[in-house]
Amino acid sequence: MSDMSANEQEEGVMEASPQGGERTTKDLGIARPLRLNSGLLLGNRLAKAAMTEGLADRRGWPGPRLERLYERWARGGVGLVITGNAMVDGRYLERAGNVIIEDAGVHEALSAWSAAARKGCAALVQLSHPGRQTNRFICGQPLAPSEGPPVKVMASFSRPRAMTPLEVEATVERFVFAADACRRAGFDGVQIHAAHGYLLAQFLSPLTNRRADVWGGSLENRARLLLEIVRAVRARTGAGFTLAVKINSADFQKGGFSEEDSLEVVRWLDAEGIDLLEISGGNYESPALLLGPGLRESTVAREAYFLEFARRVRGVTRLPLMVTGGFRSAAAMEAALGEDALDLVGLARPLALDPDFPARLLSGEVERSEVQPLRVKGKALGMLAEASWFGDQMDRIADGLDPDPGISPYGSIARYLTWQTARGLRHRATYRPPQTVQRG
């Protein structure tokens, strides 16, 4: 949590802005504290959004590199950090090097990570299951709501099989165990990842969920897994442990999860009493967050990719709302907060290149991030370049170095593919699940 006391932070909200003269920090909407329904107080309206790190050790446990990375971000001025997606099932990873939370052995390492991530801000762990978006080096046959074609990205994925009802129910238990493990380790809460085409988003989409049982068919049935996880996590961890959900505004695929679907799921999440909702969009086959969801020039100029949908969300809920994607300037952040379109600004890539950007923004030292899209030809290669190049920057911070904007994106791609292939195959060959699957 912040070094400033809760009373001092909340008093800062109530102080009147000075008349005339230079703008002070207290004039900024992004500098105002935010208290969530769980009671968690965020020191300001800037959040480090989840980015996949791939920095866990061979067991899938966090270690010194993740501790260094998150302590740097925690001291960089944000009110909240959200970790990259920690896996609830070690058989199925989003990438090699994911943190895995599936047995009690991880507790000490998880506690050390929590202590580092909370030095100056609040910290949530993002919990996820990749489903069909598990690459073929890690798993020869990934899981999905229904059998279907593999993810169509660079021949990196295998054809998934449909989950059995028992596997679906066990997934609820895995999320509950992981959430409670994070609570016991000292984290302030968790974020359930139901966006970007991972398993919970696959259940929400009629394109990937064609089940004929209680887990498929109607939107209510397709949302059942997400809602059961939310209820079970809340029952296990209690009202004082922050429970957030990340959801797509849409998956931007014809016949897929639509904005109207998303608004209905938001209503249900509101009824469940979650503490924070984050809006994003897309999946591996339609990566809106990385490449933009067919963005109009006005959207790019406004910076926030999903702001129009956020306004629609405001019409159905007053849940604290975080929007991630495209924010670069203080002016755009202030405008979005000023019109009450959101409560929390999510920042990802700017913090990989400049971990102190929030503090410099709040102090007035800078007005915007200098992060620019990488210029690499081809949609798939461009997506890979973005992931690998910014991953290289996080690697440097984790090693105690400063980011290096001069790194070649093509070199990053080569390193990423070599490393992911080798480590993915090693994980596949050596991973052994816990003898007893932990239950929530």
Each language-model region and where it sits:
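Flavin-dependent oxidoreductase catalytic cores
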Residues: S2-G440
